[in-house]
Amino acid sequence: MFVQANSLEEIKRYFNSELSNLYTESEIKLIIKELTIKRLNISPLEFILVSRERLSESDLLFYYDALKRLRNQEPFQYILGEVWFYDLNLKIDSRALIPRPETEELVDWIKTDLKNHSQPTIMDLCSGSGCIALALKSLMLESNCSAAEYSEDALSLLRENTKRTNLSLDISKMDVLNEDDYSYLAPNSFDCWVSNPPYIPTREKSLMAPNVLKYEPLMALFVADEDPLIFYRVIAEKALVYLKKEGVLYFEINENLTVSMLTLLEGLGFVNIEVRKDLQGKDRMMKAQTVSSHHES
């Protein structure tokens, strides 16, 4: 790694020259800031003060390794090994999808809706890193939160994050498409279900960023072209059995499938269906409520 001096200023210069074809200047600035805060174990305020301080050889090796990985378009959250989600510092690596800001918006919605609910029972299906369930638990400590995930890799990360945040979740391995995997749940026992399931049709793979395809777990992203609503349909059908009357179901959705989702949920008998856009103006979240009677399982 060629730097003229062992200082952060030089690291910034070098990163900009090496990565400008892959990242914007502001992205590079953010990456360096996050890497430095983690490496030197300093606060964001202290970061402003260290730009001319001398770095050790091991520090330089750390930045060089990060640069190599960034050149290969590995997400910098995986390089850091952690991500902030709703004031929680979560461990993150290629075992699970990187939590996105849009998902924080979904948590916001649920938090607002449940604020007057005492001890709500919540289930997060296809939980991944556990970001939704853990954020909701941190916001409503009196809640009973469950998290279900099928991937063994994601489950191990979910357990690590539960321990890391000192929060309690009921965690289970569950294939949401398998009828038998719901048998341990009690009917009419949940106030809220939430899921951010795989929702990108395989045909859209070519539209995805290369770093997502190369590093993030594809089983958490893609569904078969012939049935892109499969996860939503099965989860919604089961929600009718396991949600309490007037229980609420929340989904993160594919903006191209809004109309199909509305048709699906209305057809199943859900009421008070609402769609919300994310900060980019795309349909991203959906909410539906059960009526005062339930289907039989």
Question: Predicted regions span which residues?
Answer:
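Short, glycine- and charge-enriched coil/turn segments that flank and shape catalytic ligand pockets
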Residues: 56-61, 112-121, 142, 178-188, ...
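A general structural signal for well-ordered alpha-helical segments in protein cores
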Residues: 12, 32-33, 63, 76, ...
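SAM-dependent Rossmann-like transferase core, predominantly class I methyltransferases
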Residues: 49-51, 64-141, 145-160, 287
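Short, solvent-exposed loop/helix junctions and linker helices
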Residues: 5, 9, 22, 56-60, ...
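S-adenosylmethionine
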Residues: 143, 148-290
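Alpha-helical elements of Rossmann-like donor-binding domains used by nucleotide-donor carbohydrate transfer enzymes
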Residues: 14, 34, 62-65, 105, ...
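N-terminal auxiliary segments of SAM/dcSAM-dependent transferases
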Residues: 2-80
